[in-house]
Swiss-Prot record:
Lineage of source species: Eukaryota, Metazoa, Chordata, Craniata, Vertebrata
PANTHER family documented for this protein: PI-PLC X DOMAIN-CONTAINING PROTEIN 2, PTHR13593
Entries under SUPFAM superfamilies matching the protein: PLC-like phosphodiesterases
PROSITE patterns assigned to the protein according to its UniProt record, in alphabetical order: PIPLC_X_DOMAIN
InterPro entries per the UniProt record, alphabetical: PI-PLC_domain (IPR051057), PLC-like_Pdiesterase_TIM-brl (IPR017946), PLCXD1/2/3 (IPR042158), PLipase_C_PInositol-sp_X_dom (IPR000909)
Alphabetically ordered keywords of this record: Hydrolase, Lipid degradation, Lipid metabolism, Nucleus, Transducer
Protein name: PI-PLC X domain-containing protein 2
Tissue: Expressed at highest levels in brain, followed by stomach and small intestine. Detected at low levels in kidney, ey, thymus and slkeletal muscle.
Substrates-to-products reaction catalysed: a 1,2-diacyl-sn-glycero-3-phospho-(1D-myo-inositol) + H2O = 1D-myo-inositol 1-phosphate + a 1,2-diacyl-sn-glycerol + H(+)
Organism name: Mus musculus
Keyword Hydrolase: yes
Protein role: Catalyzes the hydrolysis of inositol from phosphatidylinositol (1,2-diacyl-sn-glycero-3-phospho-(1D-myo-inositol), PI). Could also hydrolyze various multi-phosphorylated derivatives of PI, such as phosphatidylinositol-4,5 bisphosphate (PIP2), releasing inositol-1,4,5-trisphosphate (IP3) and the protein kinase C activator diacylglycerol (DAG), therefore mediating cell signaling.
Length: 340
């Protein structure tokens, strides 16, 4: 029965976003653009905090500018070292954690975005940029790309988690929040009870965007959710075994109500990791060989009040990450049918 439902769900949402001459589907070509709209009706009333939702780590880092100044998120030692042009090229290999653009991630099924932002030295127009060691695209450009997708897919809901701010004073925050408001308008969902956030309740009000803002500035705007409503425990390890143990432990400690929960299924390089794999970069040195084990862990999980909710990964296109997370929701379907 479960196999039949999975096949049916793939017919509904597993279409191809772009043709592949070989006839096979890579992870980046499987299109889950409308997976939320395609969930069975009884899941429309399940709180989003109880669904399995795929997300990406450092979601914006598919492009970073090696010609820009080093970001204020780096130490003074790194900033001084980066005066050597080769250093920035190497930094780029370790700053990029995604291959897909926002649009491509959305089409692949990603619905949670991990965002770090900063002002840029020398800019006088208060423009805000994404940042991960090096500066990425303008936040405004990213927001517009996301909004264009949402307009075309009115039943898809996204989480934008602004969790790190660098070199930003109150005027920068005001500028950023006004940009968010201008980009999404009536799609913005006001902060309220987490348990009341279901697909049906959001669809009825035409809300599509939940903004989490890890800064006291959130109190000034009703559509900014406090960061404490979406905890994302960080393992900070290069060991996949330690990562999985950490994920299991933090899930067991998850609050059953009042917050979403992010399981960061990511490995973090240490200085010696970078030194050993300097030229290879993050993807080739640490991520690629460990992703299969991480995906195997994901496959063993169940969503629900005490189960997984949002799961994030680096390089979400390298494996069938998003589809694997989405299909965990079939387990909620199983439970519902068992009770009938």
């Amino acid at each position: 029965m479960l196999a039949f439902r999975k096949a049916r769900r793939k017919l509904r949402m597993g279409t191809i976003c772009s043709p592949n001459p070989s006839g096979t589907k890579t992870a980046s070509e499987v299109c889950n653009a409308d997976w939320m709209a395609s969930l069975p009706a009884h899941l429309h009333n399940v709180p989003l905090s109880n669904l399995a939702i795929p997300g990406s780590h450092d979601s914006f880092s598919y492009w970073v500018d090696e010609k820009s100044p080093v970001g204020p998120d780096q130490t003074q030692a790194v900033i001084r070292l980066a005066r050597i042009s080769l250093v920035k090229k190497l930094m780029k290999k370790w700053s990029v954690t995604q291959n897909l653009t926002f649009r491509e991630q959305l089409e692949a099924g990603i619905r949670y975005f991990d965002l770090r932002v900063s002002s840029k030295p020398g800019d006088t127009d208060q423009e805000i940029y994404f940042i991960h060691g090096l500066f990425g695209i303008k936040v405004w450009d990213g927001l517009m790309e996301i909004d264009a997708f949402l307009t075309q897919h009115p039943q898809e809901i996204i989480f934008l988690d602004f969790n790190h701010f660098y070199a930003m004073d109150e005027s920068h925050h005001k500028c950023l929040v006004l940009r968010i408001q201008e980009a999404f308008g009536n799609k913005l969902c006001p902060a309220c009870s987490v348990e009341s956030m279901t697909l049906r309740s959001l669809w009825e009000k035409k809300y599509q965007v939940l903004i989490f803002y890890h800064c006291p500035f959130y109190k000034q705007y009703p559509f900014l959710w406090p960061g404490k409503k979406i905890p994302a425990p960080w393992a900070n390890t290069t060991s996949v075994q330690k990562l999985i143990l950490f994920l299991e432990t933090t899930l067991s400690e998850r609050a059953p109500r009042g917050a979403f929960h992010v399981s960061q299924a990511i490995l973090t390089p240490r200085v010696k990791t970078i030194a050993r794999g300097l030229v290879g970069g993050l993807k080739n040195t640490l991520v690629h060989r460990n992703l299969p084990a991480i995906l195997d862990w994901v496959k063993t999980q169940k969503p629900g009040a005490m189960g997984v909710n949002i799961i994030t990964s680096d390089f979400v296109d390298l494996i069938d990450f998003a589809t694997t997370v989405i299909e965990l929701n079939d387990l909620l379907e199983d439970r519902a049918l068992t009770k009938c």
